Amino acid sequence: MAIILGIDPGSRVTGYGVIRQVGRQLSYLGSGCIRTKVDDLPSRLKLIYAGVTEIITQFQPDFFAIEQVFMAKNADSALKLGQARGVAIVAAVNQELPVFEYAARQVKQTVVGIGSAEKSQVQHMVRTMLKLPANPQADAADALAIAITHCHVSQNAMQMSESRLNLARGRLR
């Protein structure tokens, strides 16, 4: 069993999603958004750090998964996003959590089956996969999709390791 915290970082809205993985079964534990309504960036970063720390304390995750930075057209936006990611990662590292990063395209490919999927498609698939009564908010859905991606990637890595071990022992042909 593992609890995974997924984070969709943003300097104004940071989505989070928490799921439990038992074997191949995924279950929803919680999700939402950390909204920073102050104008100055240092105060927003402080709120993101405090919010992520509070979520970690509440859910006690085993793994922390976050979206990688993509190259934005606006350099200022990309820098702010990078800073938001940074404080979220520091919150995880301060709690001794292992950090995993996934590209947005990989997340969409894993959850929807198309790397260029729309936000509404991600929301629908997250709702379906986690058996939710309604679509989660867009940023929370993205964070849940990041957590789901971590489960799939880690499950595949474990299966590959077991296959290699069995091959080395002469059990696979």
From Swiss-Prot:
InterPro entries: RNaseH-like_sf, RNaseH_sf, X-over_junc_endoDNase_Mg_BS, X-over_junc_endoDNase_RuvC. The keyword DNA damage applies. Mg(2+) 2 binds at E67. GO terms for biological process: DNA recombination; DNA repair. Mg(2+) 1 binds at D8, D139. Binds 2 Mg(2+) ion per subunit. The keyword rRNA-binding does not apply. Its cofactor is Mg(2+). It comes from the Bacteria. GO terms for molecular function: crossover junction DNA endonuclease activity; DNA binding; magnesium ion binding. PROSITE patterns: RUVC. Gene3D superfamilies: Ribonuclease H-like superfamily/Ribonuclease H. Keywords: Cytoplasm, DNA damage, DNA recombination, DNA repair, DNA-binding, Endonuclease, Hydrolase, Magnesium, Metal-binding, Nuclease. It is found in: Cytoplasm. The active site is at D8, E67, D139. GO terms for cellular component: cytoplasm; Holliday junction resolvase complex. It catalyses: Endonucleolytic cleavage at a junction such as a reciprocal single-stranded crossover between two homologous DNA duplexes (Holliday junction). Its EC number is 3.1.21.10. Belongs to the RuvC family. Homodimer which binds Holliday junction (HJ) DNA. The HJ becomes 2-fold symmetrical on binding to RuvC with unstacked arms; it has a different conformation from HJ DNA in complex with RuvA. In the full resolvosome a probable DNA-RuvA(4)-RuvB(12)-RuvC(2) complex forms which resolves the HJ. The RuvA-RuvB-RuvC complex processes Holliday junction (HJ) DNA during genetic recombination and DNA repair. Endonuclease that resolves HJ intermediates. Cleaves cruciform DNA by making single-stranded nicks across the HJ at symmetrical positions within the homologous arms, yielding a 5'-phosphate and a 3'-hydroxyl group; requires a central core of homology in the junction. The consensus cleavage sequence is 5'-(A/T)TT(C/G)-3'. Cleavage occurs on the 3'-side of the TT dinucleotide at the point of strand exchange. This is Crossover junction endodeoxyribonuclease RuvC.
